[in-house]
Amino acid sequence: MEQNKPRLFAVILKATLLFVLLNFAFIFTHNLPFGKLSLYNNAFPGRERFPFGETKESYNLSLFDLDAMFASHILAGTTKASDEYRVFLVGDSSVWGTLLTPEQTLAGQLNATSIKACGKTVRAYNLGYPTISLTKDLMILDQTKAYQPDMVIWLTTLEAFPEDKQFESPLVANNAERIRDLIFKYELNASTKDPALNYLSKQDQTLVSQRRAVADLIRLQIYGALWASTGIDQIYPENYERAQTDLEASTDFHGLTTLNAALAIDVLDAGMRAIPVPTILVNEPMLISNGLNSDVRYNFFYPRWAYDAYRHQIAELAAAQNWHYLDLWDLVPADEFTNSAIHLTPNGETLLADKIAEAIRSTCN
């Protein structure tokens, strides 16, 4: 036994040194796109929408690796057919489809109808992500260039515009280097040194510090097998709290008294020119309350003064820039919203899909 003690100590010492070496060697892998290594579109099908969620029962999770998100998406595994007119739908949780199955989403309903554009068959891809920020949308738009879009439809709303919202999305804050590159590339007004951006120090890039990110990549693959066998990617509760229709008598919107110089118009402009294909900007439908204090606020998000000013400003800008623009703010009746003033029922999505289909056909060139 006495002779084994030195050997045991040597083994422990070697293991410790090896771990320390691997831990710090991991720093040199920081720029390697591990997220592109995926079982999706190989061992099992790609997802119809980006991974998002924090409940095991949904076989889903939220992560910050944009490469992994795209690698898990059906888009990454779909070779573009010669007769495919490829349409990307970009936006927030309303596009992603909160409380909707993939078939009930805007993309699902467009694909269920044989829409023809430029002599080809439209195939829509759901690239929505459930946080509200123009900068988040721009980051996703910039990543889509390699996937051969024929058209982009960008659905958004006023809540995505305020300057103080741009880096609030965890997906944005935790992709600081990407955002820095976008700021330089599109000459955005934002600061690359904004404290909301989480740049990784050398210590943050070690294996120990990155263990959660590595675990998330592994979990995403495991959940893929479960998702592929069940089709479940979110929880659909039988009962949920409906969107508010009785509202506070408040005119507050992000502490602003005017929208002048308060909106990230530079980010909107960058997104509209990010991809050299027809891009349709859509002011997405929202709930218009007729309940308590509905003369002051349209809904939980917006006082009337702010939303009216926003609509006027964007309409003028779109006309001046000759953008393709659809203002569908009042398209959907209030009873066709679910748990938010921007989340639609399947019937509400059908109303939206009909308008989007018309726009695709008329904008195709």
Question: Where are the regions a protein language model picked out?
Answer:
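Catalytic His-Asp segment of secreted/periplasmic serine-dependent ester chemistry enzymes
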Residues: I288-N365
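Membrane/wall-proximal cationic-aromatic binding patches
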Residues: N31-C118, D335-E336
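Residue-level recognition of beta-strand->loop/alpha-helix junctions
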Residues: N126-G128, N283, D327-D330
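N-terminal Lys/Arg-rich, disordered targeting/topogenic segments
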Residues: M1-R7
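Hydrophobic membrane-insertion alpha-helices, especially the h-region
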Residues: V11-T29
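Serine-dependent acyl-ester chemistry module
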Residues: P162-Y310, P333-A334
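Second-shell loop/turn segments in exported
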Residues: S93-L100, N126-P130, G255-T258, F301-R304, ...
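Membrane-embedded segments
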Residues: A76-Q166
